[in-house]
Amino acid sequence: LERTMTERSVKRGEYLYQGDRDCTGVFWLRYGQARVFLISGTEKQITLYRLLERDSCFLSASCVIKNINFDVFIQAEKDCRILLLPANVYQDLMEKSFPLATYCNQILASRFSDVMWVMEQTIFTSLDRRLALFLLEQKAIDESSDLHITHEAISNHLGTAREVVTRM
């Protein structure tokens, strides 16, 4: 396993995964921060969840996960260092190890729960409340009351237009 894993650095703003353009494999974030998001046909974005230090991401191996019919994108929000397990090795391990498959399914279920929360918020919660919740979350992640984030970045997280965030 150790021989098949690679380690790489990803700069802030770079993509760790770009939907159907690649099948990277499973990665673990040694340090840094990334966002997992969708992009619509009109280039609108919405953040599904964030990856923080020591988080793993299985959707970057979606080409070997059955019935994943959507493309996610993963972009570094801060400089990152990742450990990468190739998709074919991951698939082989999943077929041979029931405990590993169970563990991975638990993480996927947790991420699905995160996505459903975003969906619920987007559909049933007013934008001003979603914006307030986002800013509080950002404050907690940054561990600072001073937030350095653009209206464009906020709108990408919330799945709305920059002009809407500016008017809020």
Residue ranges with predicted function:
Residues 1-31:
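Regulatory nucleotide-sensing modules
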Residues 6, 15, 33-38, 56, ...:
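Short beta-strand segments in beta-sandwich/barrel cores
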